[in-house]
Amino acid sequence: SAVTIARQEEYSKKMILELTKAVREHQLKYSNYSLPVVRTLEYIISHLSDELKIINLAKQVDMSVSNFCKLFKNETGLTVNEYITTQRCKKAAEFLSQTNFPVQEIGSYVGYDDNNYFVKVFKKVYNTTPTQYRKNQRKK
């Protein structure tokens, strides 16, 4: 019917606008970075639970480790490992505030198989333990 077609057209328009907005935001977010760095940032974010080695990240963008590390640091202001740690802790913080998953499970999900090490790294980034972070988030 005409109503159904109108609804589908409206839905399609909304989806196109949302997609266009997402693409624009993505372009703005990465506009200051070269293609190798953009690819690396995206790869890291989508593979946080994997073992992320600099040598493999450099290979993915066909660069030597030293050139890759220099480029990454120059463009992001962080070393590759600092960026990985920051992103892992950011993702862990999201899980801590939005889920009831056990801390150890969250640590493992973001790439830390050793729970003690995860707690140590998280505490270094957020100045609090994952458990305390969760409690503080729940109070808000």
Model-flagged regions — what are they?
Residues 40, 44, 89-92:
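Short alpha-helical "packing" element that flanks the helix-turn-helix/winged-helix DNA-binding module
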Residues 135-140:
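Generic C-terminal helix-cap and adjacent flexible tail
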Residues 23, 45, 51-87, 99-101, ...:
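Basic/polar phosphate-binding segments, predominantly the helix-turn-helix DNA-binding elements
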Residues 15, 75, 92:
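DNA major-groove recognition helices of helix-turn-helix
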Residues 12, 102-103:
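Hydrophobic alpha-helical connector segments
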Residues 1-42, 67-69:
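An amphipathic alpha-helical interaction segment
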